[in-house]
Design a protein with these regions (language model features):
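Conserved short strand/loop->alpha-helix "switch" segment adjacent to the catalytic nucleotide/phosphoryl-transfer site
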Residues: 9, 35-55, 105
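Glycine-rich/acidic phosphate-handling loop/turn and adjacent ATP-lid/helix
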Residues: 82-111
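Short alpha-helical Gxxx[C/S/T] motif in the catalytic ATP-binding
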Residues: 113-117
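Glycine-rich ATP-binding loops of the HATPase_c
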Residues: 124-135
Length: 145
């Protein structure tokens, strides 16, 4: 059996999450960005799979819009908990509201991506930590699985 030269190895056994990651890998490569992923998760999720994919898509979309040269993602499953980490480098200044919330820099963006991530995590007793240091935007989220 011959393997196609440009064939992509799946990220994980979960079909829906693999599809999301594959889509964003393709988009990142089309933008000339390095896309790295370390995924260690079960095939089946105990948490709402659709909500997890919405959260993942929103974080990756934000990274894709802002990344200067790379996007790095890590998903781990340990002790009935999923942890998700999305990082990208960026140039320029980030905008924040008076309440210290991040604001969209997209000309036609709604700014609802992070808000929907926060809402999903809140409804699932999750945790969100966002840091921006030395030109790196780093989002870390955990939720029960």
């Amino acid at each position: 059996m011959e393997i196609e030269k440009n064939a992509k190895i799946p990220f994980c056994e979960n079909t829906l999450i693999n599809a999301v990651l594959s889509e964003y890998r393709t988009k990142a490569e089309q933008e000339g960005l390095e896309f790295s992923a370390r995924i260690q998760m079960p095939k089946e999720l105990a948490c709402d799979e659709a909500e997890f994919c919405v959260m993942l898509s929103n974080l990756l979309e934000n990274s894709l819009d802002a990344a200067k040269s790379y996007i790095a993602i890590s998903i781990k499953h340990l002790n009935h908990q999923l942890s998700l980490n999305v990082k990208n480098d960026y140039e320029g200044e980030l905008k924040k509201s008076a309440e210290n919330n991040y604001l969209t820099t997209k000309p036609q963006g709604s700014g609802l991506g992070l808000k929907s991530v926060e809402a999903i995590l809140k409804s699932n007793s999750g945790f969100l930590k966002i840091e921006d240091t030395d030109g790196v935007f780093d989002v870390f989220a955990t939720l029960k699985n």
